[in-house]
A protein has these predicted regions:
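AlphaC helix of the protein kinase catalytic domain
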Residues: 133-143
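Activation segment of protein kinases
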Residues: 83-86, 181-226
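AlphaC helix of the eukaryotic protein kinase fold
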Residues: 79-101
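Conserved short submotifs of the Hanks-type protein kinase catalytic core
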Residues: 118-132
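C-terminal lobe helix-coil module of Hanks-type protein kinase domains
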Residues: 65, 160, 220-325
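Activation segment signature within eukaryotic-like protein kinase domains
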Residues: 151-152
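A short, aromatic-enriched beta-strand patch in the conserved N-lobe beta-sheet
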Residues: 112-114
């Protein structure tokens, strides 16, 4: 691991701590249910299942190969406990329906929703060979401006595409962004926003709205907007807020809201007082601090109205940083 001046050692950064938790979960090994032990099996007489790539509260993710064409894929299988919950199954079906409409180089779409004869429900997605943004942050520390801003702009473009289709991500975090090799991309990579598992259409019919009205706040506490914490309706500005927190961590290795646990960080967000970017890294442009501050405004009305607006402001902030460096020279 490489230490970067002015940034905490990777294992002490917020991304590093989350990575340790994720790695510990994988080391626990498979549980007793079939969904957690599919490695080296043939799923639905079509997919050769390889190693387990990860797990979450709702699913297990595996590397797989489609035996009909040899394509390498990622398959997300719903946990048995949740598949017995009709609302969870409906949520997954909605996820597939929404994400199948996505078609953009900076988002990962879902190819197929399937169900085996014995009731395992799964999603088939392209396998992205690359590095999670969270792992890059652990390995390299804070990203330089000339890499971080272009990657954020790519994320904005992918999310704008989703928002144009009335889809809100609702769970943006570094663990849901893959950096895939791309000769034309900044630093030879391209950012792909993944896991629209909590995605939600903005304009819902009453019966659809009931599917997500479970009384449980969904999302990742460190990155949720104040309105998401309160269980209020979400719109593109909620994703703007979450992406701004992702950006803050990218450039500093720290989160803008502090607390001893997730609950305290959520309370801090409801009070609307994030750390200032340049309190953590003084060499970053003042304009970038202003842009992220606006994106993290407590009131959604004070944020950028769209990802397009956020992207344009980020590009302007990067230019201001370049000119400032030239002026200092």
């Amino acid at each position: 691991m490489v230490e970067v001046a002015g940034v905490s050692p990777p294992e002490q950064t917020s991304a590093g701590l989350r990575t340790l938790v994720r790695q510990a979960a994988l080391k626990r090994g498979p549980g007793m249910d079939r969904a957690s032990a599919l490695t080296n099996s043939l799923l639905d007489e079509r997919y050769e299942v390889g190693k387990r790539l990860g797990e979450g509260g709702m699913s297990y993710v595996y590397l797989a190969k489609d035996v009909t064409n040899g394509e390498t894929l990622a398959i997300k299988v719903l946990t048995p406990k949740l598949k017995e919950d009709k609302s969870s199954v409906e949520r997954l079906r909605r996820e597939a329906g929404l994400a199948m409409r996505l078609d953009h180089p900076n988002v990962c779409r879902i190819l197929r929703l399937g169900e085996t004869e014995d009731g395992l429900i799964y999603l088939v997605m392209p396998y992205l060979a690359g590095e999670l943004l969270s792992d890059r942050e652990v390995r390299q520390g804070a990203l330089p401006l000339d890499l971080g801003v272009p990657l954020l702009v790519q994320m904005c473009r992918g999310l704008q595409h989703a928002h144009d289709l009335q889809i809100i991500h609702r769970d943006l975090k570094p663990e849901n962004v893959m950096l895939v090799p791309d000769d034309k991309g900044p630093g030879g990579v391209r950012a792909v926003v993944m896991d629209f598992g909590l995605a939600k259409e903005r304009r819902q019919e009453p019966e659809v709205a009931k599917l997500t009205a479970t009384g449980i706040v969904l999302g990742t506490p460190e990155f949720m907007s104040p309105e998401q914490i309160r269980g209020k309706p979400l719109d593109p500005r909620s994703d703007v807020y979450a992406l701004a927190i992702v950006a803050f961590e990218m450039f500093t290795g720290q989160l803008p809201f502090q607390g001893r646990n997730a609950q305290e960080m959520m309370i801090a967000r409801l009070r609307g007082k994030p750390k200032l970017l340049r309190e953590v890294k003084t060499d970053l442009p003042a304009r970038l601090e202003s842009v992220l501050g606006k994106a993290m405004a407590l009131d959604p009305a004070d944020r950028f109205a769209s990802m397009q607006g956020f992207a344009e402001a980020l590009e302007g902030a990067e230019e201001s940083g370049v000119f400032a460096k030239l002026f200092r020279k």
